[in-house]
């Protein structure tokens, strides 16, 4: 790493984390030095994570978010090893009459595809749909499109639940370290299940969650990516000891799972409480990893 401006940093044997702005920190990472990237970006202004001017979740419009996010996409392309992959977790975003003047959905996943393609990435997989229970979504959001009373009133405003997506992109070029699997560790039945474009078996509650990371009135939501999704992506597109990078680390879900699977991790987080909690989580993951290695040594 070249000299970078950070608020804080910490590390273990298998991980480095930086407390700061993801674009600033990413600029200090050497070119083609990361083997896999996985993250969940801020969903524009749908959720507010902090009151920082550098928080992309505080953008005033979709256009402003895209302008800021393009700087990061450029750095992600630069630091990723040729022939390697980047997985992005996202969802399409609700439009509200109060904020947007209409009720509907914004094609956020499509906007991300266009930003990453403009940066040089190739779309590697279709949008893998991760099913979410529409009843749970209705109870949490009270979205008019999911209410049964709206079906009775005027179902032209009724719609289906909004799923999560996992989209994977690839940096063109020859992969210098092919990712190999054996039939024993990756049986054909597992591949047939994972090759489906809709994943019905993801447990939405299997996340790295910690209430103590909530601290400010301006924060409304913690949305960690399901560990099961991270595990599948890391299994598919990395080798043991590869470097897994996440620019929006949150409380450390992607890095935590990477360490548990014998990979190295680099993460960046801007919010104070998330950063502090991620350090605790990564220390715990590393302790567990080395304890298991000692047990079977």
Positions of predicted regions on the chain:
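Class I S-adenosyl-L-methionine-dependent methyltransferase module
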Residues: 111-112, 279-297
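Core catalytic lobe of class I
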Residues: 2-277
């Amino acid at each position: 790493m070249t000299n970078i401006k950070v608020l804080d940093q910490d590390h273990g044997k298998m991980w480095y984390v930086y407390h700061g702005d993801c674009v600033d920190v990413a600029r200090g990472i050497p070119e083609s030095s990361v083997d896999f990237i996985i993250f969940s970006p801020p969903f524009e202004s749908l959720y507010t994570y902090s009151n920082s001017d550098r928080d992309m979740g505080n953008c005033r419009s979709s256009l402003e978010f895209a302008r800021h996010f393009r700087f990061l996409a450029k750095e992600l392309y630069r630091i990723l090893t040729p022939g390697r992959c980047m997985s992005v977790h996202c969802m399409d975003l609700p439009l509200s009459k109060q904020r947007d003047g209409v009720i509907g959905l914004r094609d956020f996943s499509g906007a991300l595809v266009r930003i990453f393609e403009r940066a040089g990435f190739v779309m590697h997989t279709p949008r893998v749909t991760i099913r979410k229970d529409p009843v749970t979504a209705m109870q949490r959001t009270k979205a008019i499109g999911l209410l049964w009373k709206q079906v009775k009133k005027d179902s032209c405003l009724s719609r289906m639940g909004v799923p999560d997506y996992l989209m994977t992109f690839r940096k063109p070029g020859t992969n210098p370290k092919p990712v190999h699997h054996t039939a024993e560790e990756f049986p054909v039945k597992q591949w047939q299940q994972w090759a489906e474009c809709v994943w019905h078996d993801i447990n939405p509650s299997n996340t790295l969650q910690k209430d103590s990371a909530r601290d400010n009135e301006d924060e409304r939501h913690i949305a960690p990516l399901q560990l099961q999704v991270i595990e599948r992506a890391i299994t598919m597109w990395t080798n043991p000891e590869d470097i897994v990078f996440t620019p929006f680390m949150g409380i450390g879900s992607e890095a935590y799972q990477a360490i548990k699977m014998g990979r190295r991790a680099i993460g960046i987080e801007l919010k104070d409480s998330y950063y502090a909690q991620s350090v605790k989580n990564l220390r715990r993951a590393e302790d567990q990893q080395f304890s298991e290695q000692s047990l079977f040594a």
